[in-house]
């Protein structure tokens, strides 16, 4: 049995679950706070629920783009270091940075999706969500999800570019 590979699998599962739950909870609480405090949107509002679901899916999908770069990083780190504890700390540190970067990009993409809808239509999106307009929620949600699908690979490539690959040629 390859202990480093087993450690990689366990770390990946635990990291994905813990960070996934934390990021989705943070996103949900942020949307709930903004909806209630800033825009006075009721909790039983179906349109806001659809909008929230779209944002949660998009954020989760964008942050999932970190998984492959993290696996590459772990393989590189495991060849450099024999100490399991140091390997674990390095992986968690890099992983947190990469996940935070993907989370910030995901929030930006969601904000951009809502901004695009506001720009291309004369409708006040927030007021329509507040009025429980399902059609507006579906269109805005579709824009957000589509932008996430289109930018997912770019985010993965961006994260991949930060991996400290070893030099291929000696200097």
Description of each model-found segment:
Residues 4-22, 90-108, 171:
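Alpha-helical transmembrane segments
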Residues 18-34, 67, 71, 104-120:
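Membrane-water interface of transmembrane alpha-helices
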Residues 32-40, 67-83:
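Membrane-helix interface/capping segments
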Residues 38-54, 124-139:
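Membrane-interface segments at loop-to-transmembrane junctions
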Residues 39, 109-134, 155-164:
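Membrane-interacting alpha-helical segments
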Residues 47-70:
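A generic, lipid-embedded transmembrane alpha helix
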Residues 73-96, 160-171:
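Hydrophobic alpha-helical transmembrane segments and immediately flanking/interface helices
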Residues 135-155:
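Final/C-terminal transmembrane alpha-helix of multipass membrane proteins
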């Amino acid at each position: 049995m390859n202990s480093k590979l087993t450690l990689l699998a366990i770390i990946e599962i635990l990291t994905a679950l813990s960070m996934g739950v934390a990021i989705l909870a943070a996103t949900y609480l942020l949307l709930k706070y903004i909806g209630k405090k800033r825009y006075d949107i009721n909790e039983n509002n179906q349109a806001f629920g659809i909008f929230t679901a779209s944002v949660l899916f998009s954020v989760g999908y964008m942050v999932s783009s970190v998984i492959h770069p993290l696996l590459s990083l772990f393989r590189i780190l495991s060849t450099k270091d024999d100490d399991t504890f140091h390997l674990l700390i390095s992986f968690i540190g890099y992983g947190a940075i990469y996940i935070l970067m993907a989370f910030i990009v995901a929030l930006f993409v969601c904000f951009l999706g809502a901004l695009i809808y506001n720009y291309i239509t004369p409708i006040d999106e927030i007021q329509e969500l507040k009025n429980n307009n399902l059609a507006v929620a579906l269109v805005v949600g579709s824009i957000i999800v589509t932008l996430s699908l289109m930018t997912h690979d770019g985010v993965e490539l961006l994260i991949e570019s930060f991996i400290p690959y070893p030099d291929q040629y000696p200097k």
